[in-house]
Amino acid sequence: MSGNAYVTASPESEPAFIDEGRCAIRNWDDQETVVSFYFRAMNKGKMTVSLQAIGHSQVEVSLLGETEEVELASDTLTLVEVGTFKVKEPGYVKVDIRGKKINAGDSFGNVESLVVKGNVGPVVCVNGDFSTHFGRRGPSTHMSYTLPEGDVEWFYNEVVVPEEGDIPSSYYMACGFGEGYFGMQNNTPYPRRILFSVWSPFVTDNPAEIPDSMRVQLVRKGEQTTINDFGNEGSGGQSYMHYDWKPGERCRFLMGVRPDKNNTTVYTAYFYDNHQNKWSLVASWRRPQITTWYTHAYSFLENFNPVMGHITRKAYYCNQWARTADGKWLPVTQGRFTCDATGNQKQRLDYKGGVENNDFFLTMGGFFNDFLESGTPFTREGNVTEAPDVDFSTLE
């Protein structure tokens, strides 16, 4: 349960939640609460579904258009059969469990595992030693871009999030580079952000451990920008500004990488403020122990909240351009779709990318069926003749 189930409905006053560490449903005492298990049946056929559960209650189990009532009547974990079901087509199966009546105690009990037997396998789910935290978040998806030959200083990208893809706890990263990333987040219930981060060359998840000589140093920042350290996924310098971007809005990003003196490199990020019709400086950082131009251009889409991995996210990445060190704009039209370890290790198969209406797109999460193999290349066509209209002399 800890890696494959979500509370998909619950009263707002005292919502139930899944305790990953203890593999338990907490606050499960309201009939409004629905706990949903997800797994992928790779073949059609018949399967018997059972609950490994504890408690004294009646619960309702729904899947594949059928509903069965099951009685839990044990103080220890017991295997309780739900029924036999026909899987007509390979794909994800959602199993909803709802409490109907508490017979003893103060909750419906706990369902620790869902047991599936039959000829529909192999069954794809988060299992073994794989992280339940990252498994429940879902597979992050990436689009890596082919930069032109020679020294590239600037990478330009546009992001459009459709209404159906605008989900809380999402990072729509636009301009990744070899040493960091730059994009926008839906941080609901907090204000939406434009986020720009640069990793330190010192490898640690604790920024306090970074020696002074290996710290990323702030060069300058925008007036509305907040500066922090960051950790947990590498460490370094973080900068962000609040911007109330909307679904359907075309958000423009400009990211620069330029080698500097004394074996350092300066990274500078600008975001186009559609409300004020101007480019706004997010920040400029200096990273030690490296001399480089722009490398490894890519975008990604991720969910950073494990309780929301059952909801699909989507974003379009549009009109990519690279500007060489000698000032020439060149279109970027080739991309390669990949995903993270959650997808590569086949813990989940709800990831996809590609080209729609001559724009790259990424989608992930929500247990959809038409996944795409990691490593698939794509080429966009569309307008590759009009370079971005950026007056660099006016940038902060």
Name what the model sees in each region:
Residues 1-244, 252-259, 263-396:
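Extracytoplasmic
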